[in-house]
Curated annotation (Swiss-Prot):
It comes from Paracoccidioides lutzii (strain ATCC MYA-826 / Pb01). The keyword Isomerase applies. Pathway: Carbohydrate biosynthesis; gluconeogenesis; Carbohydrate degradation; glycolysis; D-glyceraldehyde 3-phosphate from glycerone phosphate: step 1/1. The lineage of its organism: Eukaryota, Fungi, Dikarya, Ascomycota, Pezizomycotina. One of its GO terms (biological process) is regulation of entry of bacterium into host cell. It is an enzyme of class 5 (isomerase). The active site is at H94 (electrophile), E166 (proton acceptor). Homodimer. The N-terminus is blocked. This is Triosephosphate isomerase. Pfam families: TIM. Belongs to the triosephosphate isomerase family. Induction: Preferentially expressed in yeast cells, the host parasitic phase.
Length: 249
């Protein structure tokens, strides 16, 4: 069975109630590829608003979740709280949190495990810096990040994960991996899944690309055999997000 195309929109720390209402209203009224799974991740304060507004084709994701149950963790969100508000997805490991907030591989792995244990699906973000790519360490970096998660998440639980390869040097910079670069890394991730998790996981788990995805480059990327969709940043705030969702039409 072919893997279902997946497009996530990470709004990051952008938007107001008015602008997010406008974005979701436009998505609800747009003609969207019915064979594409769509998930949007607004700022935490607008999660409930987004969930109330979104129609059946658009699911809502948190941008972050903590690895502990409810308790004395100021400023954090628990899996239980997200589930209480009927949020079904969360991001984990986005490079902005890895770099700016110094979240290491093990912390990301614990968050992923906590989310899955609590019934959430996870968009697991991995990727290398420009220095790591120039040093030829791209595959080493992404497999190290995946290995940490594999220490926490059992093979049977990986069906709750979508892997998002986001080269740090391409996020918000206007630079984008070539189709060949993206396919090479995605194929390596698929190989890792086959060897470390299971052949079934390699066949079924979606590996999506993020990093300056636009309406101009999405179709070439979507045509690659191991690119199963996108995690879109800035472009998810614009009308062009619809074009990216429809990249395979």
């Amino acid at each position: 069975m072919p893997r279902k195309f997946f497009v996530g929109g990470n709004f990051k720390m952008n938007g107001t109630a008015k602008s997010i209402t406008h974005i979701i209203t436009n998505l609800n009224s747009a003609k969207l590829d019915p064979s594409t799974e769509i998930v949007i991740a607004p700022p935490a304060i607008y999660l409930v608003l987004a969930r109330q507004l979104a129609n059946g084709q658009v699911a809502v994701s948190a941008q972050n979740v903590f690895d502990k149950p409810n308790g004395a963790f100021t400023g954090e969100l628990s899996v239980e709280q997200l589930r209480d508000e009927k949020i079904t997805w969360t991001l984990a490991g986005h490079s902005e949190r890895r770099v700016l907030l110094r979240e290491d591989d093990e912390f990301v792995a614990r968050k992923t495990k906590a989310a899955i244990n609590g019934g959430l699906n996870v968009i697991l973000c991995i990727g290398e810096s420009l220095e790591e790519r120039e040093a030829g360490k791209t595959i080493d970096v992404v497999t190290r990040q995946l290995d940490a998660v594999a220490e926490e998440v059992s093979p049977a639980e990986w069906n709750k994960v979508v892997i998002a390869y986001e080269p740090i040097w391409a996020i918000g910079t206007g630079k984008v991996a070539t189709t060949e670069q993206a396919q090479e890394v995605h194929a390596s991730i698929r190989k890792w899944l086959n060897e470390k998790i299971s052949p079934e996981a390699a066949e079924n788990i979606r590996v999506i690309y993020g990093g300056s995805v636009t309406e101009n480059n999405c179709r070439d990327l979507a045509a690659q055999p191991d690119v199963d969709g996108f995690l879109v940043g800035g472009a998810s705030l614009k009308p062009a997000f619809v074009d990216i969702i429809n990249a395979r039409l």
